[in-house]
């Protein structure tokens, strides 16, 4: 789909956006980081916005999370643990940094649907799962939407903190966080 030069340009652009934000990353800096002439950049792409929108289609810059990524066994703890693992495997601190960098007013209208697709997929998957577990009498609450958003926020929060602060806020390892948070969540809804 993209040639090697285009990929270098897209990767350079996204790295700069993570570091500086969309508005502060210039096409000149992108070209230098990619190791190409700025004229080459404009032969390959219409401009910075085109580079970003193209990069958002690449697996390196889009977690491409789908409903089929999640497998359910019917065991609340096991299922939510697996959900968290898949979520954190795909929605990495790097992806969060890119999402933050792309929330620029001049780009937001074009990038928001792609960025929103990931949490919407997760929320819908969780809501449907909680509804099934509610029908089976495994969970008490019937606020499936609320539970889905809370569980998603718990996972996103951890990834966001790691993206923003590394281990400076908490040295808790991902797997320890998943086990502990799932255990507390299940205790609260079970």
Model-identified regions with their sequence ranges:
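Amphipathic alpha-helical packing segments from all-alpha helical-bundle domains
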Residues: 89-97, 110-136, 149, 160
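Residues in the recognition helix of alpha-helical DNA-binding motifs
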Residues: 44-45, 129
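C-terminal alpha-helix
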Residues: 16, 129, 180-189
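Short, basic, alpha-helical segments at the C-terminal edge of helix-turn-helix-like DNA-binding modules
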Residues: 56-63
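Hydrophobic/aromatic-rich alpha-helical bundle segments in the mid-to-C-terminal region
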Residues: 134-183
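Basic, helix-initiating cap at the start of DNA-binding domains
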Residues: 1-20, 24-39, 43, 50
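Hydrophobic alpha-helical connector segments
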Residues: 66-96, 145-151
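Helix-loop "lid/cap" segments that line or gate small-molecule binding pockets
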Residues: 84-91, 98-107, 185
